[in-house]
């Protein structure tokens, strides 16, 4: 299995500015992510950033890093620039690991790479896990996904999908936990074929993408297929807020 991992790392986060450099148990967060990715089967792990502080920090801990344009609208655009800088062939595979996932299991990195290699019809691959608690089902920050019998994603949404017509007529507090496994939360790790990245940056933002603010809908809107499968391991949430950062600090400090 041959693939590389790219970790996009933006410094200017609106909710947690400077989070790639946030200290977690004596190391910057981006170093934790990098070291987790290095435990996968990737042939190369690269941080892609538009910030000199992040660039210098990665160099200091011995990581590989590329400086990319500050004008990218998404991490996917940044990945395409990395593929271009590295001169990757169109059939090569890049796994996008988010720069705010210091607890990412290496096994899921391998899994998503294997899934795109094992399904020739897929231009991208990603993962999901069951959502049980009603509050999370109705939480717009928890992106839901539905798929067909072959594992091809049909749609991603911030809304509750599928919609249980009878059960969802009552208040959320009275909705029973979902135990049938049909409600799946999307996990934000992707494997892409470079050819898909080259096409992605040429496509305009789709209407559905603009409404939901989910860039993967641009792929589906242009007729390409995304393979989706349940993650082989539990994937702890990433770091979006100070509360998330405190949670991760506590976990890694005690480990």
UniProtKB/Swiss-Prot annotation:
GO terms for biological process: CMP-keto-3-deoxy-D-manno-octulosonic acid biosynthetic process; lipopolysaccharide biosynthetic process. One of its GO terms (cellular component) is cytosol. It is found in: Cytoplasm. Keywords: Cytoplasm, Lipopolysaccharide biosynthesis, Nucleotidyltransferase, Transferase. It holds the Pfam family CTP_transf_3. Its main location: cytoplasm. Pathway: Nucleotide-sugar biosynthesis; CMP-3-deoxy-D-manno-octulosonate biosynthesis; CMP-3-deoxy-D-manno-octulosonate from 3-deoxy-D-manno-octulosonate and CTP: step 1/1; Bacterial outer membrane biogenesis; lipopolysaccharide biosynthesis. Its EC number is 2.7.7.38. GO terms for molecular function: 3-deoxy-manno-octulosonate cytidylyltransferase activity. It comes from the Bacteria. It catalyses: 3-deoxy-alpha-D-manno-oct-2-ulosonate + CTP = CMP-3-deoxy-beta-D-manno-octulosonate + diphosphate. Activates KDO (a required 8-carbon sugar) for incorporation into bacterial lipopolysaccharide in Gram-negative bacteria. Belongs to the KdsB family. NCBIfam families: kdsB, PRK05450.1-3, PRK05450.1-5, PRK13368.1. This is 3-deoxy-manno-octulosonate cytidylyltransferase. It comes from Saccharophagus degradans (strain 2-40 / ATCC 43961 / DSM 17024). The lineage of its organism: Bacteria, Pseudomonadati, Pseudomonadota, Gammaproteobacteria, Cellvibrionales. The gene is kdsB.
């Amino acid at each position: 299995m041959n693939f590389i991992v790219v970790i996009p790392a933006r410094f200017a986060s609106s909710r947690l500015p400077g989070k790639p450099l946030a200290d977690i148990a004596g190391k910057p967060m981006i170093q934790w992510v990098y070291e987790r990715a290095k435990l996968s089967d990737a042939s190369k792990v690269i941080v892609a950033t538009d910030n000199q502080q992040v660039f210098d920090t990665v160099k200091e801990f011995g990581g590989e890093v590329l400086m990319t344009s500050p004008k990218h609208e998404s991490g996917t655009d940044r990945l395409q620039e990395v593929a271009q800088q590295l001169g990757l062939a169109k059939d090569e595979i890049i796994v996008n690991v988010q720069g705010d996932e210091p607890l990412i299991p290496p096994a899921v990195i391998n899994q998503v790479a294997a899934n795109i290699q094992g399904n020739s019809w897929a231009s991208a691959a990603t993962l999901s896990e069951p959502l049980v608690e009603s509050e999370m089902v109705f939480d717009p920050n928890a992106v839901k996904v539905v798929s067909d019998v072959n594992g091809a994603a049909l749609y991603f949404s911030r809304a509750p999908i599928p919609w249980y017509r009878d059960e969802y007529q009552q208040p959320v507090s009275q909705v029973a936990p979902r135990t049938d496994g049909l409600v799946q939360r999307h996990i934000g790790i992707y494997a892409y074929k470079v050819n898909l990245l080259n096409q992605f940056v040429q496509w305009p933002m789709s209407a559905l993408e603009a409404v939901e603010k989910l860039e993967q809908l641009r792929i589906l809107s242009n007729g390409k297929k995304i393979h989706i499968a349940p993650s082989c391991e539990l994937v702890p949430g990433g770091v979006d807020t100070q509360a998330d950062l405190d949670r991760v600090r506590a976990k890694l400090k005690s480990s």
